[in-house]
Amino acid sequence: MKAIRFEPSVPSEIRVIAQEAALGILKALHRYAETGQGRVKRLSGEYDGLLRLRVGNYRVLFDESADAITVHRVRHRRDAYQ
């Protein structure tokens, strides 16, 4: 399983999300870290090099190395790319 790391701003982004949705996001991250499965898409343009995990109405923007996942943003889909 890959380690999951968070940028300093991410915990505060997760705290403002409804508890049920936040738990779903964390479960989806753990599932991806363990199995590599999930609704993931490689991004381009301004976000080139990042991946997006889709969890309901939320988007998790992260990058991945051989041993870790670093989460950069967790936002509602309408705000994720602004």
How should these model regions be labeled?
Residues M1-R54, S65-H72, A80-Q82:
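Basic, Lys/Arg-enriched alpha-helical interface segments
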Residues N57:
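Glycine-rich phosphate-binding loop
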Residues V60:
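NAD-dependent ADP-ribosyltransferases
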Residues R75:
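Residues forming the ATP-binding cleft of Hanks-type serine/threonine protein kinase domains
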